[in-house]
Amino acid sequence: MKTGIVVRVARQAGLVALFVATALVGTASGVLFAYADDLPQISALDDYRPNTITRLLARDGQTIGEFATERREVIGYDEIAPALRNAIIATEDAGFNQHFGLSVSRIVITALKDIFTGQRAGASTITQQLARDLFLRQYMREGGAFERSLERKVKEWIVAVQIEKRYTKPDILRFYANQIYLGHGAYGVEAAAHLYFDKPAKDLAPEEAATIAAIIQAPERLSPFVDGRRALMRRNYVLQRMEEEGYLTADQSRAAQERALVLQGQPTQERSIAPYFVEDIRKTLEQKYGAKALYEAGLQVQTTLDADLQVAANEALDRGLRRIDKRRSGFRKPARNVVAEGHAIDRFTVERWKRPMLAGDIVPAVVMAVPAKGASGTARLRIGTRELDLPAPAFAWTRRTSPADLFKVGDLVDVEVRTVKDGGPETLALEQAPIIEGALLAIDNRTGQIRAMVGGYSFTRSKFNRATQAHRQMGSAFKPIVYTAAIDRGFTPVSIFVDEPVSYTAGPNQPPYQPLNYDRKFEGPVTLRRALEQSRNIPAVKAMQEVGPRQAVAYAARFGFPEKMMPYLSLALGAAEATLVEVTSAYSAFPNQGVRMTPYSVNTIADREGNILEENRPEAHEAIRADTAFVMTNLLRGVVQRGTATAAAKLDWPLAGKTGTMDEYTDAWFVGFDPNITVGVWVGYDEKKPLGNGETGAAASLPIWIDFMKAYIDTRADRKNPPRFEPPGNIVFVTLDSGITEAFINGTQPQGVAVVQTAAPASD
């Protein structure tokens, strides 16, 4: 009896299945011709070119920037680890290697479930998923009605079969593996392998391959960065499926399942080491090639940036701005209190705590406890799961002895990690983000290539690039241009200017122009060298008068400065505005025998196949004669050895440069060079307000420049045998009574003195 019932039920189920299959096949046949003309051309896969990442590379090949709508790296079939190929097939389509694009049995089972239980189940093969993702999404919108859903499904079947007829199974799996979305902006298995495990897809271990295959079903829910427990369960399910399908032995599957889920990547893209530099290039690329090419075409951009120097520039500017901020502004109350914001203080977390920490890193910390008001002692701070003491020496710069005078429980403060232990912070020092701004730019003298660029304290805080966009008054940093014009007109380093009170007619209904020196004193007769080294204002104005303001403006234009400068005597003291890149580029002509190279940041741009679209080469402009340039270089060396920049002399390296300070200390500059590189530093507020009394170029900008140059010198292979400023053949050297060995253009040296040598001295 029971056997008969079972037979009848089985027969009825079989008839239903046969009916459903017949109906589906009939429906498919009926609509095939109706839809055929409306379907995409499958041959488009012959030239499979999905959206890929545009990459910016430093000189050493390090990636410094990426732009993409879909973060994808296209790879070949052989670059996909066999374990990953097997994991995908075992999980997504076990019959992949046998079917012709459709799995009729899965279609029937799915249809029956839908009809009899109302449960929707996935029946799509890998080929169907590929058809849907590559072609059909752009041809139709998803509809809620059954008829609309059936129409979409039939088109999907047709396209899947066409794909199977045209391409091999390895081709189809390659297309699929490069196309699928795998969470956090990563498309394709190569991008996912780097995202989750920081390695290429070809090097994935079975448990890593299973993790990636596990994500395909629901990337937003199954990402191990989102839910580690769920991701682990799903990974182990994939490993079990691989065992069931014969891709792993039971022992291999068990061993892989027992391994912890260890992630090596980052859930978000790491910040660029050169965000201002990268953004500058991004704007140029978008303007030249268009947004579509920038974000989808996978351009490969080889830049001029030196990654090591860029890191040094970041650190030097950060340290310098923090130093100035502490001495000028003091401690500012924390802007955030997590308790006041409604957070549970024990559970509050920040993204930065999830990343590794090294000594010197600046990280946020939450204040967990402070002593009573007015009582000295230590504060208790938390970083991640670690609670650490902040002793009095760690906040001594605030000039407060009680932590309660500085902050309260729940405040979020910045701290510097002084030492680390067991992968986490051990000792801390209180820090704060400076409100002052600055910029640093380094240019290769012989090519004009930009080696490092920092456009401000924080790109997150402000994307305004103070290295290229901020027009600021130059102060005394403009004086070398004036003195260069004077030397070209016959002046020499020993020409005399009288440093004395002066008054010039400024024009109708204008008060007379009466420049003063920084110290409000006058030295009487001084040499041009002395005037430049000590940055005396009156001699510079007199040199401008001798040259002629209009001629000085014309000279400035030869150095790359804007021609719109007004020809006033105050120009000698830097009243005109310029950008840091303009000033730094101008100075680079001095050590380069008078030739200024146009600054540039991109060497080559190639398409995804490596075809060169653009190649930039150095562009030279002869600013001044080589002999004049060398005399100025020798004079500017004196600024470092005896003048306003003597702090740099301790570097024991051939250096030259000039400080610059504007009235009321609104702008502080130092621009200097060695035989190979020119580096400019500017410090100030975005709004033109004083930095504070005494914040000159020597006090504010020079220490930043020195920090950077220390790191630069350490990178040089010739640091034990420094390069030299090589003189042209018509330069002669004369040792003066002062003991200085002075450089002269032959024929301009003082009469009756002996020429001591015709090669550059090792030092003055």
Predicted regions and their residues:
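Peptidoglycan glycan-strand catalytic modules in the bacterial/periplasmic cell-wall system
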Residues: 2-3, 7, 51-53, 57-249, ...
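N-terminal type II signal-anchor transmembrane helix
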Residues: 1-57, 95, 115, 324
